[in-house]
Each structure stands twice: as C-alpha cells, then as structure tokens.
Amino acid sequence: MTDPILSLKERLSGRSIYLIGMMGSGKTSTGRPLAKRLGYGFVDADAVIEQVAGCTIPEIFERDGEAGFRSIESQVLNAISQRHSLVVATGGGVVTKPENWGQLHSGIVVWLDVNRAQLIERLRDDSTQRPLLQQPNPEAALDTLLQERRPLYGEADLTVVIKDESPDAVADGILQLLPTLIKDPTEQRER
C-alpha cells in the first residue's frame, strides 16, 4: 500500500504551499505541523520581513507606513517563491497587491477561513501587536479588513473553514484535501 504523504509529495512535485488568511487565522501555527508532515521547509514570511528590515513589523509601519511594509512584503514573497518545497505562512494583507498573486500561484494557495467572532477572540488573546488594529475601535477596523479581503482570499486554490480545530487537525485536513487539487501523475501516464 502506498504511503499517502509520499504519494502527495510526488504529486506536489516540489510546489510550495502558501497559507493565506486574516491575522489570527492560524497560518503560522498550522504551517509548522503541515510542513513537518510533508517533509517541507517552513517559512513565516512576517519573520523574514522583520529580518530583512532589521526591525519589527509595527516599527516598519511606523517608519514607512503600510505602503512601505507592502513593498518589502512583495520583495520577500518574490524571493521566497524562487524556492520550492516550502509551506509559507504569509501576512494577512499579502493578497491586497495584485502582483503578489503571480508568486502565490507558483504554488498552491490555501485560505484558512476563520469567522469574525473567532478572529476577535483569537486576536484578543494574542500578545502580538497588530498595526492595522491599533485603532480606537479595533473590531470596526477588523470588519473593514474582512470586507476588503474576503473576496481576495476567495481566489485561493483551496479553502479550509476552521471552527475550533487544533492546528494539527487543520494541517491534517489540508493534507486530506490537497489530493483533490492535484492529478496523480501515474493516472495521467496511463491514459
């Protein structure tokens, strides 16, 4: 009997998997176990941005504004997309620049879709400073971002609706769904 992960890796042919979704959707916490199960490398794009910039994301926003941050984010995504066999946790706003989609679609794009109430709860419990939520009414700011981004996230190759599953369970769910996107090369050869 064939190992399903080995078969999936063969089908992926080194294509990277890009996790997209709102801040707090679990891209990093899901990406790590997903990469481990696939034997892929894991990259947190926000961490790479901080390394490249030499400061934190809130400091980049303060110094360069959102436009400056998005420019660095696009450069980092371009560099990451040159590599293969990665699971990449992207920043929540990566989808807002049309030019980023070319890099994202060099791999498989998976949207981690978490409902508003869960996002609010997760972000409330999260110690990470989120520059776009540093407003008098963070919930209204989140609503605006959701309204702008949900249609863009909908362009993903695969949507995974997350309720209260653990990151490990979400990773397992992605592994079960990925084969539905990718043809088995042995089936293609037989035709």
Curated annotation (Swiss-Prot):
Pathway: Metabolic intermediate biosynthesis; chorismate biosynthesis; chorismate from D-erythrose 4-phosphate and phosphoenolpyruvate: step 5/7. Its main location: cytoplasm. This is Shikimate kinase. It comes from Synechococcus sp. (strain CC9902). Mg(2+) binds at residue 28. CDD domains: SK (cd00464). Its EC number is 2.7.1.71. Keywords: Amino-acid biosynthesis, Aromatic amino acid biosynthesis, ATP-binding, Cytoplasm, Kinase, Magnesium, Metal-binding, Nucleotide-binding, Transferase. Monomer. It catalyses: shikimate + ATP = 3-phosphoshikimate + ADP + H(+). Binds 1 Mg(2+) ion per subunit. Catalyzes the specific phosphorylation of the 3-hydroxyl group of shikimic acid using ATP as a cosubstrate. ATP binds at residues 24-29, 130. It holds the Pfam family SKI. The keyword ATP-binding applies. It is found in: Cytoplasm. Belongs to the shikimate kinase family. Its cofactor is Mg(2+). GO terms for biological process: amino acid biosynthetic process; aromatic amino acid family biosynthetic process; chorismate biosynthetic process. Substrate binds at residues 46, 70, 92, 149. It is an enzyme of class 2 (transferase). One of its GO terms (cellular component) is cytosol. The keyword Nucleotidyltransferase does not apply. The gene is aroK. GO terms for molecular function: ATP binding; magnesium ion binding; shikimate kinase activity.
